Each structure stands twice: as structure tokens, then as C-alpha cells.
Amino acid sequence: MEKVKPDYVFHLAAQSYPKTSFTSPDDTLDTNINGTSRLLEALHHCNKIDPVIHVCSSSEVFGRVPEEHLPINEECPFHPASPYAISKVGTDLVGRYHAEAYGQKVMTTRMFTHTGPRRGDVFAESTFAKQIAMIEHDMIPPVIKVGNLESMRTWSDVRDAVRAYYMLVTVNPIAGEYYNIGGSYHCTIREMLNHLISLSTKKRDIKIEVDPERLRPIDADLQIPDTTKFTNHSGWMPEISFEQTMKDLLEYWRSRVLSGEHFLTR
């Protein structure tokens, strides 16, 4: 760090898959909480640098929010519903501690669901798009394996998310601040899946089957953010539509399947 002398540090490294955290809670907590602490401690002890630091928390910190408390603003109580979410509560608090205790220019985001091309196939929309692409090429039977389809999510495009992160650290950054960031379109996982299927060349043939292995013991079932604070501060607004994001995601998996790449079916 002292050699590179960064102006900005974006800390997004994490064990970021909630379902994995149920089977690997210790690794998730260590990676996400202690990993954040080690990075911020290292930056604190570096000489002659004072970067603006983005610590990426998660909307999962809010967990199971009653419908009457929607949309979720920054002051909504934490109610984490997975070891991953607990680890992100720790990440969130470690970041704010370093801002308050040491004056480091740390800002924290609670990003709601964002997706697009290249998102890993452990996440619902990516595994659905991947399965659809494989079905279109007759690589698997026309059955999409799913988990819980009733959770409500607010969707944004990863390209909008990256733009938000850049604006976070460049538009009047305020040490210790924390922001909810997310899209404006929300729907259930089922509705998202139905939209992806509607884009398929084999939409009339595709069936849906619940796979118990894909279900979490507990889920954050209502994720609708109030992003007023960040929008008012930075001027950021999502620009890419849900429909465009889903189209691009499916095209990404079609191109990977068409390339002949070998990968596991999830």
C-alpha cells in the first residue's frame, strides 16, 4: 500500500454467498469480519497515505423486515438471517469504528441485489440463466431446479452499482457515512425466473422443479430499499432497466455454453 499509494480503496472481497455461510459459518465470519479488520488496520498503519475507503456491507444485514417497515432506510434495525448477514453486520461496524476511532475516510454501503453478466452461478438469477442456456442446447432436460421463489428482491444492474461505488468515493466523500444503494424495480424470484423463461427459445417446454438442496434454513424475504440518502448526496440513479439486465445475463450464459466450456450444472 505504501508503494502504490492508492487514492481510493474498494473493499468488496468476501465470502459472499449466503447459502454457503450456513455450512461454513466460521470461515464466513473470519473472512468477512476479520478480513475487513486486517485491511483497515493495515491501511491505518501505512505511512503517508490517506485513501478514501469503500467498505461493502450488504442489504442482508437488515434480514427479515416487516412489511410495514418498507422501504428499508439506513436506520432500520439489523436483523440478520444468515451467518453471512451476521458477518456483514460485523463488516459494517468495523468500517464505522475505523472512521470514528482513527479518522480514516471509510464509507459503508448496503447494496441491495445487483446482477448482470459474469455473476457467479451460485446466485439464483445466474443459475437460472445458465440452466436455460443449457436447455436451449439440449445439454440438460428442460427442467429448471429452483429454491425459494417467493422472496421479494429489488434489482439493479452491476454496471449501475459500479458507477454508484465510484460516485461514493469521488462525490464529496464523508468519513463514517453509510448508504443504502439499490435499484427501483422489485419483484419476486418467481417473477424474475418467469421473465428469463419468456426470453428463451424453448419457453414452451421448460418446467420448474424445487430442489430442497437450494433452500436456505431462513431467508430475508422482503428486500426493498429507500435510497433517498445516497441519491440526494451523490445524484446517482439507476439507468439500466431490469429487462436489459436479464437479457444481457442470459446472453452471457448463452455465449459461455456455446463456447463449449465445461462447468458443473447447478
Segments the model singles out, each with a brief description of its role:
Residues 9-13, 53-59, 109-111:
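SDR active-site strand-loop-helix element
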Residues 1-31:
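NAD(P)H-binding glycine-rich loop region in Rossmannoid oxidoreductase-like domains
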Residues 65-71, 93-167, 184, 189, ...:
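NAD(P)-dependent short-chain dehydrogenase/reductase
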Residues 128, 171-215, 227:
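Mid/C-terminal beta-alpha module of Rossmann-like enzyme folds, strongest
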Residues 161, 165, 181, 192, ...:
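Non-catalytic, hydrophobic alpha-helical segments
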Residues 23-41, 49-51, 60-108, 115, ...:
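Catalytic helix-loop patch of NAD(P)-dependent Rossmann-fold dehydrogenases
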Residues 158, 178, 191, 212-237, ...:
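Conserved C-terminal active-site "lid" loop/helix of NAD(P)H-dependent oxidoreductases
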Residues 242-266:
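Amphipathic terminal alpha-helices
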